[in-house]
Amino acid sequence: MSGNSIGQNFVVTTFGESHGVALGCIIDGCPPGLELSAEDMQHDLDRRRPGTSRYTTARREADEVKILSGVFEGKTTGTSIGLMIENTDQRSQDYSNIKDTFRPGHADYTYQQKYGMRDYRGGGRSSARETAMRVAAGAVAKKYLKQVHGIEVTGYLSQLGPISAETIDLTQVEQNAFFFPDVSKLEALDEYMRELRKSGDSIGAKVSVIATGVPVGLGEPVFDRLDADIAHALMGINAVKGVEIGDGFAVVNQKGSQGRDLMSPLGFESNHAGGVLGGISSGQPIVAHMALKPTSSISVPGQSMTVQGDTVEMVTKGRHDPCVGIRAVPIAEAMLAIVLMDHLLRHRAQNNAVVSDTPKIGMR
């Protein structure tokens, strides 16, 4: 299996399965001298960790990350950083009944057809459990971006099913289990999720992620545009079926006089483009949104088939998130941070000596 790495100068490679012994990742390209400890990653891992909320899966994993290499006396050495998280709460017996049955809406069928076999225990490599290592690697990128360049990455749940955030107060995101920025909707969210659990069904969501402090110039046209790489990274997250940069699909209904971001020496007057122009960062906040489908692991019966081709009625057992969008918030932050870190190092390698006489502007 290829496709386990992302990045060119800041390269993250993950390995491991949902019910395997452990998950791991290798980070190549992190500059030396960055103070780094397991605690720097643990905060974001705890935000993603299962079993911490009644709104997410009941699987309980400590997700305690271990640094295997690349750090000496509390600082990165510039060599490969090896990270590992042990799996401790697998219940593989929950999946014994689907050993020969495909779960509709999951990767079971496609993995079987592509590789001629599959790890049926929780989806194996296709499980969102793998994203724990992306979050760990993203935490390294986030620390470097903030400490060295003042770049901050923040995500939040902007919509869960029919409930959308009408006000965005980022100070409230870490104060509730939904990572939701509109406190006036928390009671409605709680009630909606309770009813959803009773029905045995699941729901989709929209997650937004913003990066502030991003300098002008990141992005490598034509095929390595910054927005293209962001979309690639976010689309690589489990259950994501759509990505928007800036106004996204809303531009379909905009006129040119509405959608362009007017500018003056005082700054940009709007940010419809989401901080990227021509595939290059403009100095405005990077804004991206992603749509996540409802998980197919539900207790509502549905038709499927066996590996032998027989039709069966399927009910998925196990411990699953009724809305995967909640725990996707720190994952989205991690992937955006990894892309920005990679492009920052690439820009520095090629254009560090470039001096422009044009004044830099930001958001007015």
Curated annotation (Swiss-Prot):
Description of how the protein assembles with itself and partners: Homotetramer.
UniProt-listed GO biological process terms: amino acid biosynthetic process; aromatic amino acid family biosynthetic process; chorismate biosynthetic process
Lineage summary: Bacteria, Pseudomonadati, Pseudomonadota, Gammaproteobacteria, Alteromonadales
Function, in words: This reaction introduces a second double bond into the aromatic ring system.
Entry-linked InterPro entries: Chorismate_synth, Chorismate_synth_AroC_sf, Chorismate_synthase_CS
A GO CC term assigned to this protein in UniProt: cytosol
Keyword Transferase: no
Official protein name in the record: Chorismate synthase
Protein species of origin: Shewanella denitrificans (strain OS217 / ATCC BAA-1090 / DSM 15013)
CDD domains with a match to the protein in the record: Chorismate_synthase
Record: residues binding FMN: 125-127, 238-239, 278, 293-297, 319
Binding site for NADP(+): 48, 54
GO MF entry, a single one: FMN binding
EC numbers: 4.2.3.5
